[in-house]
Amino acid sequence: MEKRGNFGTELGMILATAGGAVGLGNVWRFPYMTGENGGAAFILVYICCVLMLGIPCMLSEFIIGRHGASNTYRAYSLLSGGNAWKYVGLLGVATGFLIMGYYAVVSGWCLQYVYASFFGELTGNADFVNHYFAEFSSDPWRPVIWTLAILVITCLVIVNGVRSGIERTSKMLMPTLFILLLVIVVASCLLPGGERGMEFLFKPDFTKLDSDAFLGALGQSFYSLSIAMGCICTYAFYFKRQTNLLKSALQVSLLDTLIAVLAGLMIFPAAFSVGVNPGSGPSLVFVTLPNVFNQAFAAVPLVGMLVSVFFYALLSLAAITSLMSLHEVSTAFLIEELHITRRTAATFVTAGSLLIGIFCSLSFSDIPWLSFGGRTLFDWFDFVTGQIFLPVGGFLTCLFIGWAVPRKLVRDEFTNWGTVSCRVFGVYLFFVRYVCPTAILAVFLHQLGVF
């Protein structure tokens, strides 16, 4: 078995972990939820949810991963003494692998749109852009080629290991992502009428904070930090023993939230400057925003082209950092459980993800057996992993760390064996035992339409 690596610097560790959390949902979900649910009032609720749910869940996975010093499955197995709790770790590995398969498809779309933006293929009216996306996504070959491309890029990073691959790449990609984001934010906010978008995003309206808004904030705080995918636990495997887990969780959460808010500043001023309600989801990114950029920067087409290229490059970088963390979950599992080299494990994971990606991509075409029950195969992967596996895994992880793992072990990891202040340990344990499981259960039932 290959020698275990670790992160060489605290900055590299934070950027890699934050890169795993920052993804396409920060762009196509959080800004719209914020604008529709009271602006700054929703952001305040969301921050409270991150503190009450996201950070305790992340801390729990940090503790399991660092103490277990193994892949996610083995870490749960070691802490549980090999009993049934180990299957929660196996669920995390499986969830991360399945998500990677269909997430790579959308990530490939981002790469295609970088190419299309640069060569002017997205120039046209709203109907043209909508037709372009429908034609591209249903094509049997082009999306698969781009899916393969982004998986190969990810694989090349993973093959180089933790320090030379994941950490070094994160140190390059995350600052680049942030710079591109700031450039587009400035360009968007300077547009005539852009202030209406900023008002929509930030003006507090507490009358919109109903039960759906609270549950939406809870769900977003859980999903946005990549909880229960195995990513957090696997990266904690590479933490140094002196890493302050609470401080790291706070820093990762802050970066993730900051990027999500900046994404709103990137989207809404441009959309409102041309009178478009941007909406959410993939249609926002691949249909609405190309049209918005075409209209908003019509007077200076070169600027519009650059903004579009930068935007999809930004999305591609966010997708790659997320895919890196998802890939490493399964790669670390195969290395330790099958005693194979990193190169071989990474190749197997890439091949398996590509197979899933091919079928998910083809489900957008007219192949009848890839759509059933009112959903495409892509939608089924999204539904099963996002609305069942993730909340179940998060719920069980909270019960595991809160009740099954010895309190002293949890306290020792939380406080770095007494070298870090433990004044909030009791608060953390209370939340992970009672508040987090209740919140996750509420989100789970709400998503299934129970209430």
Identify what each model region corresponds to.
Residues A319-S325, A346-C360, F364, D379-E413:
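Hydrophobic alpha-helical segments of multi-pass membrane transport proteins
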Residues M1-W28, I55-F62, R66-L79, N83-L90, ...:
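Membrane-interface "cap" regions at the ends of multi-pass membrane proteins
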Residues S371, T376-F400, S421-F451:
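A generic transmembrane alpha-helix motif of multi-pass inner-membrane proteins
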Residues E2-G5, Y32-N37, H67-L91, A104-R163, ...:
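Inter-helical loop and helix-membrane interface segments of multi-pass membrane transporters/permeases
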Residues E2-F7, E167, K171-I320, T344-A345:
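Membrane-embedded translocation segments of transport machinery
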Residues R74, S107-S138, Y238-Q242, K247, ...:
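Helix-loop-helix connectors at the membrane interface of multi-pass transporters/channels
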Residues G12-C49, A236, K247-L250, L254-T257, ...:
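Transmembrane helix-boundary motif of multi-pass solute transporters/channels
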Residues N6-T17, F42-V45, A84-F97, I145-I150, ...:
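Select transmembrane alpha-helical segments in multipass membrane proteins
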